[in-house]
UniProtKB/Swiss-Prot annotation:
Record key words, sorted: Manganese, Metal-binding
SMART domains attached to this UniProt entry: PP2Ac
MF annotations from Gene Ontology: hydrolase activity; metal ion binding
Transmembrane region(s): none
GO biological process terms, semicolon-separated: plastid translation
Protein name: Serine/threonine-protein phosphatase 7 inactive homolog
InterPro entries reported for this sequence: Calcineurin-like_PHP_ApaH, Metallo-depent_PP-like, PPP_phosphatase, Ser/Thr-sp_prot-phosphatase
Segment forming the signal sequence: none
Disulfide bonds, paired cysteine numbers: none
Lineage: Eukaryota, Viridiplantae, Streptophyta, Embryophyta, Tracheophyta
Metal-binding as UniProt keyword: yes
Family per similarity comment: Belongs to the PPP phosphatase family. PP-7 subfamily.
Entry GO CC: cytoplasm; cytosol; nucleus; plastid
Length: 600
C-alpha cells in the first residue's frame, strides 16, 4: 500500500476523474450508439464512474480492483430496473433489423442479471461483461484510441475567463481526440482561433508578472513538486505524466523546464494545454522558458507552419502572440530554498570583478539572474548573453567554465559546487539534453532512462531530466524512456525519478497541398542564408514537394529534418553560394530518407 500522503493525492485525483467521467458519460446521447455493445459499455462505464466517485468506497484498502469490479456488477444488478428503463428508451428507428434483435437480447440479458452472483473468484470469467471498450468518449487516461470517425464539439471560452477543472480536462480530451484524426485540417473547428488567442493572452498577463526566478515556498507536509523536462511537442507524453502523477492541485505543484515546442507533431497542443493549467492554477503550475521558446528556434522548428496548418490565414497572428508569450516565461525556479531548476544551466557573471583577469568567465549568481530584462529581449534572443547561457548551457566532466562551440557555456563539477554553495542550495535539476545530445558524449549519462545524475559534489547534485519518450531525431529513434522528478518534503532534495514510455501514439501525416508550384522551403532557405541556386544560374532547383503517384494533383510537402548526420558539416574551404546549396541538398536528402522511414 502506498504511503498515506501519496494515497490521499491519488484518491483525490481519482475522485475528480470519476466525477468528470460520470458527467461526460451522462451527457452521451444513446442515439449515437452504433450497436448494443456500445450501449452496454456506456451503461457499464457510467456505473463504474459513479461508483468510483464514492470516497468511502475507494479509500477502503479491501477494495481491490477485482472487488471494485464485483461491487460495480452487483450494483448494476441491483439497479437493473433503471438499466432496463434506459434500454427500453432506446430509439429503435436508428437501427437495422439485426441491431434491433441485439438490443432485444440485451434487454433479456439485463432482466436475467438479478439471478447472478458476482464474487471475486468468478469475475475473471465474465467474458460477456468485459468486452473491449469502444466508446466515443475521452476519459483522460492518455492512452489514445481510434477517434477517426468522431465529430468533435468545439470548445468555447468561459465567461469572465474563469477556467475550471472541467474546462481544462475537456480541452485535453478534445486535443487528444483530434490527434487521432491524422490531419489538422479540422483543428480550428475544435479549438477556435479566438479561444487559442484568449489562452495565450490570459497566460501572458500572468507570466509577465512573475520574477525571472520563481520561488516555490510554503509547501506543506503532504505536498510534493513534479519537475518535467523537455516535451518537444509530444502531447501524449504530457498526458501520460498527468495520468501517472495526477493533475496539478493545491498539494501538487508542477514545474516545467521548457522546450514545449519541438519536432513532435503537437507543439501547439502541448503549449496551449500548459497555458490552460497555468491560468487555472497560476501558483501551482510553473512554466519556464526553454531553448525552443525563442524566435530563432521557433523558426527553425517550423512552428509558424504548424500553426498555419491549423489556422490558415489566422496563423501568423497567433504565432506572433506565442513568440511574445515566450518572452514572458520565467527562466528558473527555486523549490523550498533547496532545489534550483532551469532549462539549460549556469551562466556567466555580467559584473566587473577586478580580482579576476578574465571576468567574462566568472560564474553568475541568482541576484544577477533576477536583473535580466527577459521581457525586452530583441528579435534575436542570442544577443542577450545571460539569457543565452541560461537556455543553452550544458555540464561536462572537465572543471571550469568555458564557451561552448555552439551556444551557451560548458561548466564542470567545480562550478556546480560553487553555485550551490554560494546560493545555499542542495540540488540543480535542469533539462535541455536528451539521448540525441548525449549520443556523442560518452563521459556523460546517455539519458535513455529519461534522466541522469551528472555531478555529485559536496554541497549536492546536478541532475538532467528529459520527458520526451521514444525521441526521434532525423532518421534515428532512440527508443528512450521519458522521465519526471518527484520531490517531497521535508527538504525536497532526494528526488524520485519516474521513467515511462508512450509507444502507441498517432502519427501526423505530412501536409498535402494542392498547388505543386510551392517553393516555400526554398524561399525560406534563401532568406535564411542569403544565397540560392539562382546565383549559380540554376532556374529549376530541387524542391521540397513530391507529386503523389496515385493523384498528381496532390502534392506532399516534406518537412525539414531536425538534424542531418550525413554530409555535414561541410569543409571550410567551400565558398558561397556553393556551400549553402550543398547544405540545402544534404538536408533535402535527409528529409526524403525521413519520409521513407515513416512510411515503411
Amino acid at each position: 500500500m502506498p504511503p498515506p500522503e501519496i494515497s490521499k493525492r491519488v484518491l483525490d485525483s481519482k475522485l475528480e476523474a470519476c466525477k468528470f467521467a460520470f458527467l461526460k458519460l451522462s451527457a452521451v446521447k444513446t442515439t449515437r450508439m452504433k450497436n448494443y455493445k456500445q450501449l452496454r459499455t456506456l451503461l457499464m462505464l457510467k456505473e463504474i464512474s459513479r461508483r468510483g466517485a464514492d470516497r468511502d468506497f475507494l479509500k477502503d484498502p479491501e477494495n481491490s480492483v477485482t472487488r471494485i469490479l464485483c461491487s460495480v456488477l452487483k450494483q448494476v444488478v441491483s439497479n437493473s430496473d433503471r438499466s432496463l428503463k434506459s434500454l427500453r428508451g432506446f430509439q429503435y428507428e436508428t437501427l437495422d433489423d439485426q441491431e434491433k434483435q441485439q438490443v432485444t437480447r440485451m434487454i433479456a440479458s439485463v432482466q436475467g442479471m438479478g439471478s447472478r452472483k458476482y464474487e471475486p473468484e468468478t469475475v475473471d470469467h465474465l467474458e460477456d461483461m468485459t468486452e473491449p471498450i469502444e466508446m466515443e468518449i475521452y476519459l483522460g487516461n492518455g492512452d489514445g484510441g481510434d477517434f477517426g470517425d468522431i465529430v468533435l464539439e468545439p470548445i468555447s471560452w468561459p465567461l469572465e475567463s474563469q477556467l475550471t477543472l472541467e474546462w481544462v480536462e475537456t480541452l485535453m480530451g478534445l486535443l487528444n481526440q483530434s490527434t487521432w484524426k491524422n490531419s489538422v485540417s479540422e483543428f480550428s473547428l475544435i479549438l477556435p482561433h479566438s479561444v487559442a488567442v484568449s489562452l495565450v493572452d490570459c497566460a501572458s498577463q500572468i507570466l509577465e508578472k512573475e520574477a525571472n526566478c520563481v520561488k516555490i515556498n510554503g509547501c506543506s507536509e503532504d505536498s510534493r513538486v513534479i519537475v518535467v523536462g523537455d516535451l518537444h511537442g509530444q502531447l501524449h507524453d504530457l498526458l501520460k505524466i498527468f495520468d501517472q502523477s495526477g493533475r496539478p492541485s493545491q498539494n501538487q505543484c508542477f514545474v516545467f523546464n521548457g522546450n514545449y515546442i519541438g519536432r513532435g507533431s503537437w507543439s501547439l497542443e502541448v503549449f496551449l494545454v500548459l497555458l490552460a493549467w497555468k491560468i487555472m492554477m497560476p501558483e501551482n503550475v510553473i512554466l519556464l522558458r526553454g531553448s525552443s521558446e525563442t524566435r530563432v528556434s521557433a523558426e527553425e522548428l517550423d512552428f509558424l507552419k504548424d500553426i498555419c496548418d491549423r489556422y490558415g490565414e489566422h496563423g501568423p497572428m497567433l504565432y506572433s502572440k506565442c513568440i511574445d508569450c515566450f518572452k514572458m516565461l520565467p527562466l528558473a525556479s527555486v523549490i523550498s530554498n533547496s532545489v534550483y531548476t532551469t532549462h539549460g544551466g549556469l551562466f556567466q557573471s555580467c559584473g566587473v570583478h577586478e580580482e579576476s583577469p578574465n571576468p567574462s568567465l566568472l560564474l553568475g549568481s541568482l541576484e544577477e539572474l533576477d536583473k535580466i530584462e527577459r521581457r525586452q529581449a530583441g528579435e534575436n534572443d542570442d544577443e542577450n548573453i545571460t539569457l543565452n547561457h541560461v537556455l543553452w548551457s550544458c555540464p561536462w566532466m572537465a572543471d571550469g567554465l568555458s564557451e561552448s562551440n555552439y551556444k551557451g557555456l560548458l561548466w564542470g563539477a567545480d562550478c556546480t559546487e560553487t553555485f550551490l554553495q554560494q546560493s545555499n542550495l542542495k540540488m540543480i535539476i535542469r533539462s535541455h539534453e536528451g539521448p540525441d545530445a548525449r549520443a556523442d558524449r560518452e563521459d556523460m549519462g546517455n539519458m535513455l532512462s529519461g534522466y541522469s545524475i551528472d555531478h555529485e559534489v559536496e554541497s549536492g547534485k546536478l541532475c538532467t531530466v528529459f520527458s520526451a519518450s521514444m525521441f526521434s531525431q532525423g532518421s534515428r529513434n532512440y527508443e528512450n524512456e521519458g522521465a519526471y522528478a518527484v520531490l517531497e518534503p521535508p527538504n525536497f532534495t532526494e528526488p524520485v525519478f519516474v521513467s515511462y514510455t508512450v509507444e502507441n501514439v498517432p502519427r501526423l501525416q505530412h501536409q498535402i497541398i494542392s498547388d505543386g508550384s510551392s517553393t516555400q522551403q526554398q524561399q525560406m532557405w534563401e532568406n535564411r542564408t542569403g544565397h540560392g541556386f539562382a546565383s549559380m544560374g540554376i532556374s529549376n532547383p530541387p524542391s521540397w514537394t513530391v507529386p503523389l503517384p496515385n493523384d498528381p494533383s496532390q502534392i506532399l510537402q516534406l518537412r525539414e529534418p531536425p538534424q542531418v548526420f550525413e554530409g555535414l558539416p561541410l569543409p571550410d574551404n567551400i565558398q558561397e553560394p556553393h556551400k549553402s546549396n550543398y547544405d540545402y541538398l544534404f538536408r533535402l536528402i535527409s528529409a526524403l530518407k525521413q519520409e521513407i522511414q515513416t512510411r515503411v
